[in-house]
A protein has these predicted regions:
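Short alpha-helices
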Residues: 1-35
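Active-site loops and adjacent core secondary-structure elements that bind or stabilize anionic groups
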Residues: 34, 43-346
Length: 346
């Protein structure tokens, strides 16, 4: 990083130099330099940083880094800064100390995503899980359910993506990443790929389902789907994104919210049902929360995998904890979903 800052170059040029100078790969120095030239961006400064890094690595100036072991202090719940926050933290105190750090961050995420009522909803769901938690491994069932429940409740819909893109501190971070001077102008181009399903997720459930089933409406909405490149530093695009971000206040009445929370309810129900008869199975089902991730096609694939597991469990089959663990492992290891489908059918 110091070499990159010294030369005003991107970090990848320094990393390539260190990699080339170490000799761990069977490629010549010239082949690495050719790649930097091919990129065609700030070639001179990046080549200089590459050369400096190469020289240091090839002369034995790079040694194995042994990070110092730093003991993290025990987590303490911060002081509330508002009456609404104080009410939430008081509710958090009803949970075991081993759970509070994860649940606190979940609360923080829910408030940022929606509002304080949403954070209360998060704790209410977990209170039912805690009542069935036998306490093993420092209430691991409650902790892991809380970890993935927060992520799922804060699913990335169009308002959430727009909220991220228009945060006040974001332009400063972009300026820092591209090494732009404080008085230097730059453009920011964002890549969006909205799907018909994501547009319909903003509508009330009845209307959204109607539009999804209508071929005429689908043809019209397809005009707004596909890859889009938008300059978010322009006034019109920024204001449009701010408008979309503001739609989150109506999120509870949207099709997407209803759809996601119906699936969340099924997952939590499966976890609670298993907790009373097979705690290990309950833990594995709670860990299945990590399957649901991403946006667009990735989101559709991962949620379908979660639902496939829940359907098998809900069918009353005698599913073992190890079986669920294997299914989850296959789903996480293969983005195509083929390995998961084969394991599920076995």
């Amino acid at each position: 990083l110091a070499l990159a800052n010294e030369h005003g170059a991107v970090i990848s040029a320094v990393l390539l130099g260190a990699l080339a100078g170490s000799g761990v790969l069977p490629f010549s120095r010239e082949s690495f330099e050719a790649e930097i030239r091919k990129a065609g961006k700030a070639v001179d400064v990046n080549m200089a940083a590459f050369a400096a890094s190469y020289q240091r690595a090839s002369s034995g100036g790079v040694e194995q880094f042994e990070p110092a072991v730093v003991e993290e202090p025990d987590f303490e719940v911060p002081q509330a800064t508002s009456s609404a926050g104080a009410e939430l933290l008081q509710k958090l105190e009803a949970f075991p100390e081993s759970c509070r750090e994860i649940l606190y961050h979940g609360l923080d995420k829910c408030v940022d995503y929606q509002d304080y009522a949403y954070a209360h909803q998060y704790l209410d769901e977990l209170r039912d899980v805690l009542a069935l938690d036998d306490g093993r491994e420092d209430n691991r069932l409650t902790r892991e359910t809380g970890r993935y429940l927060a992520l799922w409740m804060c699913f990335e819909d169009i308002p959430r993506v727009a909220q991220f893109k228009t945060r006040a501190a974001r332009m400063g971070k972009v300026r820092e990443e591209v090494l732009a001077e404080s008085d230097q102008l730059f453009d920011v181009t964002e890549f969006f790929r909205p799907r018909v399903e994501e547009i319909c997720s903003l509508l009330p459930p009845g209307l959204g389902n109607y539009v999804l089933k209508s071929s005429v409406c689908n043809k019209f909405l397809n005009l707004f789907t596909g890859g889009k490149q938008l300059r978010t530093n322009t006034v019109t695009v920024f204001l449009a994104l701010r408008f979309l971000a503001g739609l989150r206040r109506f999120r509870r009445g949207m099709l997407g919210y209803q759809h996601e929370h119906a699936m969340i309810g099924r997952w939590l129900s499966a976890v609670r049902d298993a907790a009373g008869r097979d705690p290990e199975l309950a833990l594995e089902l709670a860990d299945c929360g990590r399957l649901v991730k991403g946006y667009g096609d990735t989101r559709a694939r991962t949620t379908s995998q979660m639902l496939a597991i829940l359907q098998r469990v809900e069918a009353g089959e005698n599913i073992a904890a190890d079986t669920v663990r294997q299914w989850r492992g296959k789903a996480l290891a293969d983005d195509s979903g083929e390995a998961f489908s084969e394991a599920l059918a076995a």
